[in-house]
Amino acid sequence: MLPSLQSLTKKVLAKQCVPVDQYHVLKCCGLWWYDGPITFYVYRHKMFIRSTCFSEGIELNTVLMKAAKENNHDLIRLFAEWGADINYGLICAHTEHTRNLCRELGAKDRLDRDYILKIFFDTTRNKTDSNIILCHEMFSNNPNLKNVDNLDLREEIMWELRGLMEITYMLDHDNSFSNMLTKYWYAIAVDYGLKKAIHYFYQRYTHLHHWRLMCALFYNNVFDLHELYVIERVRMDIDEMMHIACVQDYSYAAIYYCFIMGANINQAMLVSIQNYNLGNMFFCIDLGANAFEEGKALAEQKENYLIADALSLKHYNPVISLLSVIMDPEKINCMLKNYHSINMRVFLDYERR
């Protein structure tokens, strides 16, 4: 769609740093939203909007969805003229009047399955607090997603969260599509350490406190783990927590945290072997695990002969510096951020001979 001279002028104005005493000009031009100015900028060839409700900046296509959900026709027209894909607006248009406007501006009569899936995952790509919260608001309980078989999105989300979903499936009996979407956004927030988004979900979804704890363990987020376990006092069986921490390799901070809280380190070693996680296995040995015979038998049973050979050596010892009790997540992160297993080095040196 060709932009009008008026919309081009607004675009130029939206790129400027306008002083507070001239905000009335922005209001008169329709560049005002949620009690703040609308700012336009380009970053890495993508167009972004910044306003009071999303100070980090949101992609123009995503902001169009919010305008459509709110039936804000002036902003729908403006964002479309600035270059937004009007089909994104159709996803969140819940009234016939707004749907008709989107079609007048060039939207398709009906979005097919593949296009909706593309919009869904393109929108999720920007991992910021504002964007993840907005994605949740735009897609959760969205009747327009019924055009996509829920199974399609379920499969995609299950694939994105495959390790986490596999170990937590039996712990959550609410398998509704809406609940799965919320868990998806929540998991992204914990994975990327998005504090505002994490607390947004924490305040609104009290039934998902354990899900947040599982995500913190799975994604090795020791800061969130500490906040939940010690400050918020969200509780799970400590060995169950250690099991989740061991599923992804090199989750040293989460494993260490569970260890100092009393989890069975030999059991952690076996879970690591079960999941073919060589890094986690050696870290457990660094922490004093000694289930060598049982671990070797398990590795041979799973035909993982590299691990079986590693466990045949008799030269491993606990790392004394790791055995002091540290609870501060900042200190744990600092200690383990660039940690290389001493016992793994023993094995690698032996292999090079």
From Swiss-Prot:
Signal sequence residues: none
Any GO BP annotation: symbiont-mediated suppression of host cytoplasmic pattern recognition receptor signaling pathway via inhibition of TBK1 activity
Organism: African swine fever virus (isolate Tick/Malawi/Lil 20-1/1983)
Lineage: Viruses, Varidnaviria, Bamfordvirae, Nucleocytoviricota, Pokkesviricetes
Pfam families, sorted: ASFV_360
Protein name: Protein MGF 360-11L
Entry function: Plays a role in virus cell tropism, and may be required for efficient virus replication in macrophages. In addition, inhibits the phosphorylation of host TBK1 and IRF7 and thereby negatively regulates the host cGAS signaling pathway and antagonizes IFN-mediated antiviral activity.
Quaternary context: Interacts with host TBK1 ad IRF7.
Family that this chain belongs to: Belongs to the asfivirus MGF 360 family.
Keywords tagged on the record: Host-virus interaction, Inhibition of host innate immune response by virus, Inhibition of host IRF7 by virus, Inhibition of host RLR pathway by virus, Inhibition of host TBK1 by virus, Inhibition of host TLR pathway by virus, Viral immunoevasion
Disulfide-bonded cysteines: none
UniProt key word Disulfide bond: no
Keyword Phosphoprotein among record annotations: no
